[in-house]
Curated annotation (Swiss-Prot):
PANTHER family: ATP-BINDING CASSETTE TRANSPORTER, ATP-DEPENDENT PERMEASE MDL1, MITOCHONDRIAL. It is found in: Cell membrane. Belongs to the ABC transporter superfamily. ABCB family. Multidrug resistance exporter (TC 3.A.1.201) subfamily. The gene is MDR4. This is ABC multidrug transporter MDR2. GO terms for cellular component: mitochondrial inner membrane; plasma membrane. One of its GO terms (biological process) is oligopeptide export from mitochondrion. Glycans are attached at residues 97, 552, 633, 989. Residues 69-367, 781-1068 form the ABC transmembrane type-1 domain. Residues 403-682, 1135-1374 form the ABC transporter domain. InterPro entries: AAA+_ATPase, ABC1_TM_dom, ABC1_TM_sf, ABC_transporter-like_ATP-bd, ABC_transporter-like_CS, P-loop_NTPase, Type_1_exporter. GO terms for molecular function: ABC-type oligopeptide transporter activity; ATP binding; ATP hydrolysis activity. The keyword Glycoprotein applies.
Length: 1379
């Protein structure tokens, strides 16, 4: 069903396919369209045009065109007044020269009237300059804001429509880097600085026009140096762009480590892995540091050469001008006057000075162009499988068509050398149940991905009926399929919105009318009202009938998936937010939500990839019954390792190593006694029982069909349990990707953050000093050269004043020539000195900035990784926001030790030197001119305050948009499978709307003060000439004194204006410093002895937060000598829970553990079983001391850990989590993370652990073996392979206590047997506590604890529980394959 086009925030229309179509494109003139196409072309134009491609290659609309044109015209207009002033000042010089050098006695009143008239003209010109500047800064600020909004939306939209293979090969951290660092760089390079740059160029061109009109000879001589300016500008820009690209690559890798670490803090804490992750992070930063230094030196050489050329050209101008004035003085024919020469020298001197200020802008523009190219590469990329496209057949029905794989071969783009499917052929009959079973990594999930067309086969094809899958519209295909993935991915929305996502692309005609509401804000507004206290019925009624229909469909789907009871038990019900990746829900609860999302669309095809792996057997049985009911006329394809869920399938396909080994019904395959029969023998609980009586009793119970346990009674039991649960049963992950706007950017005490006093500037500076202290020598060198650069302007004023005075025709020709030679030489010497000072200044500050940046980032990450889970889970803290602390905030803070602080100090030095010199030379003139400086400074300070408030207010708002993008890319398979591109795009655009509107208002306010700061110097010129002329005519001072004081003060005021252009950078640095100091000021448990990087705090530096960091961090991925125990410990840990009560901070009204008491003896193998959400994983979270219980004791080896500080006890505990996490790094590094904190695992120990986990052969078969790089979250490995890698990581620790949370849920039966055998080897030497829903995993346990509603309701051996525990016995019956 077509959807009405709606204007997107980018000024474009979005069709129902999600494709953006510029709304104003057809009305644009042809010349503009051609220009746009020219600048949009890839690889056909030189890098010089990269900046113009950034401006014009993103489909700007009419408003953007108007803003660019008006801003450009106003920028050009802003540059013209200054050369006009040169003409007026030249005429004033002629008047002054006439009054002091004339042989005739003219009345002073005549000179004064002429001077006053010209001063009034200067005031008119200054008003024109202010108007032009305000217009061009405002227009270009809006251009920049609108451009980055278009880039954000286009980049996000492009990411959404790319095929999964693209995101698989996307460098980790790339998306975060693009939307945080690159967007900031682009905004800096396309806003008000563009107008200032245009004004500079306009000034330069106008100055030369005036110069040619006045004295063409001097102008022509100086014109020859213009190419040198552009050679240095663009040549330096090329190398800056080159080094920026290299730096970006290293920073992306480092950002990925930060992002994955902050997203999986439970793993970081469980293995005390913060030191190793910090060291790997530091390695990437060190790699980036040398390129950053080269970039800084290139920039300083570029800047220094511009100064050198400017000053050298002035030396040439003075020399040539002196010769021409000497000829005039000697009576030779000449049309040149002293005022004309002064005009040329003045405007070209000033133009050269202003042009030399262009270098920082060139650096900013080059960086913006480089960042734009990186974004445009993705934006322009054509997707091989575009889920938003309207191409392909949208009429075919999958309800009655046979699906067939024909000789399919496939390998993942991330590992092209590893075959996944090899000649796979089989048929999936319509309206039948086809089950696919096999070993981990055999290609089962890949088949599902091909059926969804997330990938295309390398060879062969997938057919639906007689049509190739490639001929069918992708959106229509995916809309006809309900998918439940092996690892269910939920978006950070409410439960209602997550389930309703299944309706977005539904192929059912009855759902089409719901689409506009699903894509709009209605559901989010509904859930927000419910969370604020409104009843669901009231809120639904207010939203209308369509929303009510969606809610009813959602409730029905949740009932089918056995999720409705735990949803109703939650305080906010369907409005409950699930958190980042569903972190607020247990694994079983997430799986039921994902199943509801698939069932709500009533699809003709169901793809179930381990859809019930995280569920207990009772829940699985209930859901299986519901699936059997809804799939009567549905084509169902299921992947399962629990063969009990596959045995009733119409056809079972057995796969191994990417090939189909056999297929048939359960009975047929068992009768063949082949691969499948072997799997059955391995998995059947009874045949593995150590007690024959257990199997006998179980069979007898099954024979009697246990009529007391009907589906209805089981459902009632489940409802009762669920109403008692409704709580988290997962180790909490970092908080939601969305962030409340009222939350502080970095609260340290969430419960009273509103009362937290605002940090003063002095406190921020004091807190930042330890970060800067190690680089004090470099900074001192930079400050000295900055002072030299600032004082050089005063030296220039002295030379200038004496030169102008020496050009008076009152002096003889020889005197004028010798003075011109002398002062020209002095100017050339000044050029050499300034060139050297600028290079040293840039290198010193550049190196100091990079070292400060390295130190700040490492210390920030260290502090973040040491915070407890409860801190990370507080409202207002999201992985995306915390990543920004380490990346953007650290970078902003480091600018205070880089070029920003250099410009600031040179400006201050210039100001003080100019003021002092002026008072020494002519204090009466200086005092009057100095009175204008507070006005200039006040305008700059006011702009600083405006920008600081604006920056702080909207820092979080754009972080939210970035977090949405990162979340979407992380969950791209779910978004593609359910065609949620439009929904994600709509949410993203809504997140941009508020900050965009506010930013546009801030533009008008902030740029008023910037324009005033720049323009007020012209008024100072007017006052200077008027007052100076008064003093000269009165005989108080000479022309030489006046022309020393004038440039000394006016260069100072111009420098202040330039300094205020850096106000946004200073504002960002101030806020960033406050955030980082807040972070580093948090006291940590065990601060007095903490130092995980291997260096204890010295007596001099006792604060561990600021321990000296190694410039060359250790290579954590290299093989090191180890002191890890060579064998497993001889004795396990004893564990006791005594009357433990606990509630998660995010759910204070829901008990997670309710008076839990269990006792585990050293060396025992114990198991925790029970329904999903009963509190099993919570026990592990408390055992690891991620949280402290509300009451009760947790005793490990006789020590109550709730009363102990620190977490040293974790050193001998290993955890295998329910969701297996890989970090950026090699396979060896990921497994080595499990080693104890004070040692490194050897290669032999890593391989031994992998053999125990049955993953060694898989790793060895990879081209790079153990050096294979894992992408973020290990996307290139299958679920079962990641699970075995997690087990290896735990075993390499040689723990005394091993915690297994569903550690074999994603394993095939053969791999599971290998792991069970490995665990048997370490049993009795290690205490093992396992959470499992597969009873064959734990039926040999020494003791099994039944956990229900946060309590232990029964315990005993397998045989004892089968005999007396009804729910346990029901699970055994359900999982038995003998039935």
């Amino acid at each position: 069903m077509a959807v009405e086009e709606k204007n997107s925030p980018t000024g474009a229309a979005m069709t129902n396919t999600g494709i953006l179509v510029p709304s104003s494109q057809q009305s644009l003139p042809e010349w503009w369209t051609k220009t746009q196409k020219f600048f949009s072309r890839e690889n056909t134009i030189t890098p010089t045009f990269g900046y113009f491609r950034l401006l014009f290659g993103t489909q700007p609309g009419k408003t953007d065109i108007a803003l660019i044109v008006i801003g450009t015209i106003a920028g050009i207009g802003a540059g013209i007044p200054f050369p006009l002033l040169g003409i007026l000042f030249g005429e004033l010089v002629d008047d002054l020269n006439s009054s002091t050098c004339s042989t005739t006695q003219a009345p002073p009143g005549g000179y004064q009237a002429a001077i006053t008239t010209k001063v009034l003209q200067v005031i008119y010109v200054s008003i024109l300059n202010f108007v032009c500047m305000y217009i061009h800064t405002g227009c270009w600020s809006m251009v920049g804001e609108r451009l980055v909004r278009r880039l954000r939306t286009k980049y996000f939209h492009s990411l959404l429509r790319q095929e999964i293979a693209f995101t698989d090969t996307l460098p980790s951290g790339d998306v975060t880097s693009r939307l945080v660092s690159d967007i900031e760089v682009i905004q800096a390079g396309t806003s008000e600085k563009v107008g200032l740059f245009i004004g500079t160029i306009s000034y330069f061109v106008a100055a030369y026009i005036v110069a040619f009109l006045k004295v063409a000879t001097i102008a022509a001589m100086l014109m020859s140096v213009v190419p040198i300016y552009f050679l240095m500008a663009f040549g330096g820009g090329h190398y800056i762009k080159k080094y920026s690209g290299r730096i970006s690559t290293h920073i992306n890798a480092a950002t990925s480590i930060v992002s994955s670490s902050l997203s999986h803090m439970s793993i970081v804490h469980a293995f005390n892995a913060n030191a190793r992750l910090e060291a790997l992070f530091a390695q990437h930063l060190v790699s980036a540091r040398m390129d950053a230094l080269k970039k800084a030196i290139t920039h300083s050489i570029q800047f220094g050469m511009l100064y050198f050329v400017a000053y050298a050209s002035n030396a040439l101008a003075f020399w040539q001008g002196s010769r021409m004035i000497a000829d005039l003085a000697e009576g030779k024919p000449s049309k040149v006057s002293v005022g004309a020469v002064y005009t040329v020298i003045f405007v070209l001197l000033d133009a050269s000075f202003v042009l030399s200020q262009m270098a920082p802008f060139m650096h900013i523009f080059a960086s913006a162009a480089s960042a734009g190219d990186r974004l445009m590469t993705t934006i322009k990329r054509q997707s091989a499988i575009d889920g938003t496209s309207s191409e392909g057949d949208s009429t075919i029905s999958l309800a009655s068509e046979e699906i067939e794989l024909q000789d399919v071969t496939f390998n993942y783009p991330a590992r092209p050398e590893v075959p996944v499917l090899q000649g796979v052929s089989f048929k999936i009959p319509p309206n039948k149940h086809t089950a696919i079973v096999g070993t981990s990594g055999s290609g089962k999930s890949t088949v599902v991905a091909l059926l969804e067309r997330l990938y295309d086969p390398i060879t062969g094809c997938v057919r639906v009926g007689n049509r190739d899958l490639k001929e069918i519209n992708v959106r229509h295909l995916r809309g006809s399929i309900g998918l439940v993935q092996q690892e269910p991915n939920l978006l950070d929305r409410s439960i209602l919105e997550n389930i309703a996502h299944g309706l977005v692309s539904s192929s059912q005609e009855k759902h089409k009318h719901l689409l506009p509401t699903l894509l709009g804000p209605s559901l989010s507004e509904l859930t927000e009202k419910i969370r604020q206290g409104a009843s669901e019925d009231e809120a639904v009624t207010e939203q209308g009938d369509v929303v009510r229909e969606i809610v009813n469909l959602t409730r029905h789907a949740a009932t089918l998936s056995n999720a409705i009871d735990f949803i109703n038990a939650l305080p906010d019900g369907l409005a409950t937010r699930v958190g980042s990746s569903g972190a607020e829900l247990s694994g079983g609860q997430k799986q039921r939500i994902a199943l509801a999302r698939a069932l709500i669309r009533d699809p003709p095809v169901l793809l179930l990839d381990e859809a019930t792996a995280a569920l207990d057997s009772t829940s699985e049985r209930l859901i299986q019954a519901a699936l059997n009911k809804v799939s009567e006329n549905v084509t169902t394809v299921s992947i399962a390792h629990r063969l009990a869920t596959a045995k009733d399938a119409d056809n079972i396909i057995v796969m191994q190593k990417g090939r189909v080994m056999e297929q048939g019904t359960h009975m047929d395959l068992v009768a063949r006694d082949g691969v499948y029969a072997g799997m059955v023998r391995l998995q059947n609980i009874g045949k593995f029982s150590s007690s024959s009586s257990i199997m006998t009793e179980s069979t007898q119970v099954d024979a009697n069909i246990d009529r007391s346990l009907t589906t209805d009674t089981l459902l009632n039991k489940e409802e009762k349990l669920s109403l008692e649960q409704g709580v988290l049963d997962e180790k909490e992950k970092p908080a939601q990707l969305y962030m409340p706007e009222e939350a502080d950017s970095l609260p340290t005490e969430p419960e009273n953050e509103k009362e937290k006093p605002k940090q003063t500037l002095w406190a921020t500076m004091k807190g930042s000093f330890p970060l800067i202290r190690p680089n004090i020598l470099l900074i001192s060198l930079g400050l000295i050269t900055s002072i030299m650069i600032g004082v050089s302007y005063t030296g220039e004023a002295v030379i200038f004043g004496h030169t102008v005075g020496s050009l008076s025709v009152c002096r003889g020709g020889p005197s004028i020539r010798s003075s011109g030679m002398l002062f020209g030489l002095l100017f050339f010497i000044l050029a050499i000195v300034k060139f050297a000072a600028v290079i040293v200044n840039g290198a010193a500050f550049g190196w100091a900035a990079e070292k400060t940046l390295y130190r700040t980032r490492v210390l920030s990450l260290r502090s973040l990784l040491r915070q407890p889970l409860e801190w990370h889970n507080a409202d207002g803290r999201t992985p995306g926001l915390l990543v920004a602390l380490v990346t953007s905030d650290a970078s902003a803070l480091s600018s205070l030790t880089g070029t920003t602080i250099g410009v600031l100090f040179s400006t201050v030095a210039n100001l003080f030197a100019g003021v002092i010199l002026s008072h020494v030379i002519a204090w009466k003139i200086a005092v009057v001119l100095l009175a204008t400086l507070p006005v200039l400074l006040a305008s700059g300070v006011l702009r600083l305050r405006v920008m600081a408030q604006y920056q702080k207010k909207h820092q979080k708002a754009y972080a939210k948009a970035t977090a949405i993008t990162v979340e979407s890319v992380d969950n791209i398979k779910s978004i593609a499978a359910f065609s949620l591109e439009q929904e994600a795009y709509s949410v993203f655009n809504r997140s941009l709307k508020a900050p965009y509107k506010s930013n546009m208002k801030s533009v008008l306010h902030g740029n008023f003060w910037l324009s005033l700061a720049y323009s007020i110097s012209t008024l100072v010129y007017a006052l200077a000439y008027w007052w100076g002329s008064q003093q000269i005519l009165a005989g108080m001072y000479t022309q030489v004194q006046f022309f020393i004081v004038l440039p000394a003060l006016l260069f100072s005021t111009q420098s202040c204006g330039q300094m205020f252009a850096l106000v946004p950078d200073i504002s960002k640095a101030r806020i960033a410093a406050s955030n980082i100091v807040d972070l580093l000021s948090i006291k940590h448990e065990g601060d007095e002895e903490y130092d995980k990087t291997g260096s204890k705090a010295s007596a001099k530096h006792t604060d561990p937060r600021f321990n000296m960091l190694e410039d060359k961090p250790r290579d954590v991925e290299a093989q090191l000598i180890t002191t890890t125990p060579s064998s497993f410990p001889t004795k396990g840990m004893g564990v006791q829970f005594r009357n433990v009560h606990f509630r998660y901070p995010s759910r204070p009204n829901q008990p997670a553990l309710d008076d839990l008491s269990i006792n585990i003896s050293p060396g025992q193998f114990c198991a925790l079983v029970g329904p999903s959400g009963s509190g099993k994983s919570t026990t592990f979270a408390l055992l690891e001391k991620f949280y402290n219980p509300a009451s009760g004791s947790i005793i490990i080896d006789g020590v109550d850990i709730t009363k102990q500080s620190g977490a040293a006890f974790r050193d001998t505990i290993a955890l295998v989590p329910q969701e297996n996490v890989m970090f950026e790094g090699t396979v060896a590094f990921n497994i080595g993370l499990g080693a104890r904190p004070d040692v490194e695992a050897t290669q032999e120990e890593i391989e031994e652990a992998c053999r125990l986990a049955n993953i060694h052969d898989t790793i060895a078969a990879l081209p790079d073996g153990y050096n294979t790089v894992c992408s973020q979250d290990g996307k290139q490995f299958s679920g079962g392979q990641r699970q075995r890698l997690s087990i290896a990581r735990a075993l390499v620790r040689k723990p005394r206590l091993l915690l297994l949370d569903e550690s074999t849920s994603a394993l095939d039966v053969e791999s599971e047997k290998h792991v069970q055998d490995a665990l048997a080897k370490v049993a009795r030497k290690t205490t093992i506590v396992a959470i499992a829903h597969r009873l064959n995993t734990i039926h040999r346990a020494d003791r099994i604890f039944m956990i229900e509603g946060g309590r232990c309701v029964d315990q005993g051996t397998h045989a004892e529980l089968v005999e007396r525990c009804e729910s346990y016995r029901a699970n055994v019956i359900h999982q038995s394959l003998d039935a």
